[in-house]
């Protein structure tokens, strides 16, 4: 067990602006709808979902598939997805056989870290076109049986989602218990989290109604024996029951604050972001959507993962050359409602600028995809000249963040 003493833990922070004179531009971004657990997208594999997102990002950015030189895709639960899942997605999207592909696992930060890696390849001059994104089919994550002799009394079946995605590897507790620790230490109540989550659901519904989310989404054709079903909308925000919201029992601790309603859900989806150099943008007469100003990672004690995103700021903003007051929109992943609430409380961020169109609580949290969804959403909702920030925590006490400017 790791010590929770502030003196015993080294808080690591890494940030970066451009690593050379090269700028990294986002020229295309798209995502699939997010399906509920074992629901509309459950028969589609994670690589297949990512292929759909990559194709859409290429088409919308007017980028030729043959231009892509490297791909980074996040995925957390890779068991039974087949060899090199990101490679499957790249080839499934029609990219060249010569494209270099890497699957990234930084738990919930995987999708955003993949975009950071793509940006670094552009900034250092290694590539002119790269894709960063994330994918997850939590519906298809298998159960595990330990290899070896079967003991007397049978064997235990292990849930792959819980084991590899939702359990702290050091203290052997569910991530929700870590969230409860943060809630208690920061005075974030059950009422605070319920109110936040209810607003998240309402904001997501309104955003879909007003056309704030639709433009970033590409429909997925789901084949079955009955034919083809077109899934073109997020599912999770439509399934809320506000009448039962505040009466649900807490999930992780008897006297706790986190419930099934004010936490994120298990979901399926994928997102892809195309990053290009200034030279490539000029040569192909592309219209860039945004410029990547800075990014970074931070880490603290694994039990305190919920506050890890706050450790990156204001350092990343300083590297980007902007002030906190310059940020028009903060996309902070809602693994649990206490995460954005802690972010707002610690940094003094204007709550109205945080997740204005809802977040993972109401939209869904396919864990390998979510970081890429944050950037995809910012690219499509910021107005020209505005600054946007994406921040996401991850198991093990880590986090990743990025600052972009809409062009």
Swiss-Prot record:
Q: Which GO terms describe its molecular function?
A: acetyl-CoA C-acetyltransferase activity; metal ion binding
Under InterPro entries, the record lists:
Thiolase, Thiolase-like, Thiolase_acyl_enz_int_AS, Thiolase_C, Thiolase_CS, Thiolase_N
List GO terms (cellular component aspect).
Answer: mitochondrion
Q: What happens when the gene is disrupted?
A: Animals have a shortened lifespan and exhibit early behavioral decline characterized by the premature onset of uncoordinated locomotion and paralysis.
Q: What class of enzyme is it?
A: transferase
Q: Where is the transit peptide?
A: 1-20
Q: Which residues bind K(+)?
A: 201, 260-261, 263, 361
Q: Which residues bind CoA?
A: 201, 244, 264
Q: Which residues form the active site?
A: 108 (acyl-thioester intermediate), 365 (proton acceptor), 393 (proton acceptor)
> Which keywords fit this entry according to its UniProt record?
Acyltransferase, Metal-binding, Mitochondrion, Potassium, Transferase, Transit peptide
This enzyme's EC code(s): 2.3.1.-
Return the Pfam families for the record: Thiolase_C, Thiolase_N
Q: Where in the cell is it found?
A: Mitochondrion
Recorded family membership: Belongs to the thiolase-like superfamily. Thiolase family.
Q: What does this protein do?
A: Plays a role in ketone body metabolism. Has an effect on lysosome related organelles (LRO) function, in a pathway with serotonin. Acts downstream of sir-2.1 to regulate aging and stress resistance.
Q: Can you name this protein?
A: Acetyl-CoA acetyltransferase homolog, mitochondrial
Naturally occurring in which organism (per UniProt): Caenorhabditis elegans
């Amino acid at each position: 067990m790791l010590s929770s003493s502030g003196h015993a833990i080294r808080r690591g922070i890494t940030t970066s602006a451009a690593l050379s004179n090269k700028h990294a531009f986002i020229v295309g971004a798209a995502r699939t709808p997010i399906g509920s657990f074992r629901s509309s997208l459950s028969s589609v594999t994670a690589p297949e979902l990512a292929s759909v997102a990559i194709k859409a990002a290429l088409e919308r950015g007017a980028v030729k598939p043959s231009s892509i030189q490297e791909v980074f895709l996040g995925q957390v639960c890779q068991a039974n997805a087949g060899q090199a899942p990101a490679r499957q997605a790249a080839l499934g999207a029609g990219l060249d056989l010569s494209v270099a592909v890497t699957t990234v696992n930084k738990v919930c930060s995987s999708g955003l870290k993949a975009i950071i890696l793509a940006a670094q390849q552009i900034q250092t001059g290694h590539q002119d076109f790269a894709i960063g994104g994330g994918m997850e089919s939590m519906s298809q994550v298998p159960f595990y049986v330990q290899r070896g002799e079967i003991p007397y009394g049978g064997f235990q079946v292990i849930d792959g989602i819980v084991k590899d995605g939702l359990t702290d590897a050091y203290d052997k507790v569910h991530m929700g218990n870590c969230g409860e620790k943060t809630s208690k230490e920061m005075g974030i109540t059950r009422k605070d989290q319920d109110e936040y989550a209810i607003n998240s659901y309402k904001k997501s519904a309104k955003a879909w109604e007003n056309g704030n989310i639709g433009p970033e989404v590409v429909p997925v054709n789901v084949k079955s024996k009955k034919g083809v079903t077109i899934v073109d909308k997020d599912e999770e925000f439509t399934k809320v029951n506000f009448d039962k919201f505040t009466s649900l029992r807490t999930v992780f601790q008897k006297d706790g604050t986190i419930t099934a309603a004010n936490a994120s859900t298990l979901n399926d989806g994928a997102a892809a972001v195309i990053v290009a150099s200034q030279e490539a943008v000029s040569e192909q007469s592309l219209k860039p959507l945004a410029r990547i100003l800075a990014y970074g990672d931070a880490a603290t004690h694994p039990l305190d993962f919920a506050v890890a995103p706050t450790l990156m700021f204001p350092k990343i903003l300083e590297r980007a050359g902007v002030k906190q007051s310059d940020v028009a929109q903060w996309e902070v992943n809602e693994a649990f409602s206490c995460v954005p609430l802690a972010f707002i409380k610690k940094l003094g961020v204007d709550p109205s600028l945080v997740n204005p169109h809802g977040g993972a609580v109401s939209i869904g949290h396919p864990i390998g995809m979510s970081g890429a969804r944050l950037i995809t959403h910012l690219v499509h909702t910021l107005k020209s000249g505005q600054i946007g920030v994406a921040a996401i925590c991850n198991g093990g006490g880590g986090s990743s963040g990025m600052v972009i400017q809409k062009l």
